[in-house]
């Protein structure tokens, strides 16, 4: 492994530090664990960088390493075991489109949106984070999570619906 | 209520439509308040989620730790790279020194044996050998109890150009060994036998001092043949000695 190889990795990977840490915090719900996850991700990625094929999506590759590292951690295993809920068989075609609540959405403060995201089950949460925070294309999300694009679309629709319902519900109760 | 374009609103908001579809939906949005409202709400939600979700940024100590880890690997890679190169150089140098010193030692041994051979030639026959006999069955047993090893002598037939004259104990590096004297057409040949390393080594010719010296290792013994006879004759005697000691 030469110096140029390390420099190349550093240039590609360091700009992803904040997004990876943010994703790790959401996944684990614990800053200390997120720190460890990110460090482990960088070490693993550098080790495996030789096998990374130029031209493929580096960002998706890094997020995939982080997510896989999380899934094999104790917290990851616990979350995986408790989150296999009513996801299978979901089809975007049957999503019911409620009346838009633009005014309510505008009232939602950051804290409420954060609480809504936090309530999502991991499979919906990670799709929403990658698509709306990291602004990944569906294809990139599919690569990161190793799932079909159709599943990305249906999970994303469902995640947004749940966030919206929670916000509407919370603000409705308040008023 | 459920406009046929509603399903495309999310794809439109996420920039997942191709240019023709994008334009088509844009045109539709201009005429459909329901879809426009849905799009606005979705964009609003995307913005809210982006702002609320970008909640954590890496603390400075994490950035330092990651950079440190990358640097450590880099430094260790550089260390190993240069360390390996340095170790290779050192190994080559050590091997060179070993080969050189071994060669020096070998040169010194040969020089001292040539000296002994020349000294012997200058002596009276009485002093050249301590056991004077052409019979190998007399010469070999004479060394019993005088040397910490044993060896075989080749049979010299009546028609052989070689003649065994006798032998005596010689020393080299404070180690006792056998010095045997042969003759071929008035040329005397000294054969020195000392203890050596196990294994065998090939015959080496050395004509550095105008004498022909051949040496080899066989069965844990070092053999040196020193003479001013020609090298073909030395080869012949060396071959007989090798066969006798296999």
Identify the function of each model-found stretch:
Chain A
Residues 36-43, 56-68:
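Structural recognition of an alpha-helix C-terminal capping motif at a helix-to-coil junction
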Residues 2, 40-57, 76-78:
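Sigma70-family region 2
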Residues 118, 122-126, 131-151, 165:
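Helix-turn-helix DNA-binding module
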Residues 18, 50-64, 149:
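Short, aromatic/basic-enriched loop-to-helix "N-cap" motif that marks the start
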Residues 2-9, 82, 106, 139, ...:
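C-terminal edge and immediately downstream basic/flexible tail or linker adjoining helix-turn-helix-like DNA-binding
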Residues 1-22, 32-35, 46:
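A short, charge-rich alpha-helical start-of-domain segment used by transcription regulators
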Residues 53, 64-85, 106:
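Arg/Lys-rich amphipathic alpha helix in sigma70-family domain 2
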Residues 80-106, 137:
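Internal acidic/polar
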């Amino acid at each position: 492994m030469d110096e140029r190889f390390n420099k190349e990795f550093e240039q590609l990977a360091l700009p992803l530090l904040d997004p990876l840490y943010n994703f790790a915090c959401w996944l684990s719900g614990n800053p200390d664990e997120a720190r460890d996850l990110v460090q482990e991700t960088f070490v693993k990625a550098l080790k495996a960088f030789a096998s990374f094929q130029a031209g493929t999506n580096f960002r998706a590759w890094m997020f995939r390493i982080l997510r896989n590292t999380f899934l094999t951690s104790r917290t990851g295993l616990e979350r995986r075991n408790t989150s296999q809920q009513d996801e299978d068989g979901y089809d975007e075609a049957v999503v019911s489109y409620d009346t838009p609540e633009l005014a309510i959405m505008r009232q939602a403060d950051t804290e409420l949106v954060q609480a809504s995201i936090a309530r999502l089950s991991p499979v919906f949460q990670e799709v929403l984070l990658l698509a709306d925070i990291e602004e990944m294309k569906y294809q990139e999300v599919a690569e990161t999570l190793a799932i079909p694009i159709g599943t990305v679309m249906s999970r994303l629709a469902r995640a947004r619906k749940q966030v919206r319902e929670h916000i509407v519900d919370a603000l409705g109760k308040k008023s | 209520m459920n406009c046929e374009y509603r399903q495309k609103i999310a794809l439109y908001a996420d920039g997942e439509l191709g240019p023709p579809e994008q334009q088509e939906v844009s045109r539709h949005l201009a005429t459909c308040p329901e879809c426009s409202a849905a799009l606005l709400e979705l964009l609003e939600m995307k913005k809210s989620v982006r702002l609320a979700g970008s909640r954590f940024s890496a603390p400075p100590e994490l950035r330092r730790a990651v950079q440190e880890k990358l640097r450590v690997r880099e430094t260790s890679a550089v260390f190993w790279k240069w360390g390996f190169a340095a170790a290779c150089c050192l190994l080559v140098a050590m091997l060179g020194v070993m080969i050189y010193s071994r060669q020096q030692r070998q040169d010194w041994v040969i020089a001292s044996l040539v000296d002994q051979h020349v000294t012997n030639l200058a002596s009276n026959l009485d002093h050249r050998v301590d056991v004077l006999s052409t019979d190998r069955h007399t010469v070999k047993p004479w060394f019993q109890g005088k040397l910490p090893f044993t060896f075989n002598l080749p049979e010299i037939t009546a028609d052989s150009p070689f003649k065994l004259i006798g032998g005596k104990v010689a020393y080299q590096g404070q180690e006792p060994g056998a010095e045997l004297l042969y003759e071929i057409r008035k040329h005397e040949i000294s054969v020195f036998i000392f203890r050596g390393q196990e294994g065998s080594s090939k015959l080496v010719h050395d004509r550095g001092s105008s004498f022909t010296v051949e040496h080899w290792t066989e069965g844990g013994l070092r053999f040196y043949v020193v003479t001013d006879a020609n090298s073909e004759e030395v080869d012949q005697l060396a071959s007989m000695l090798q066969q006798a000691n296999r």
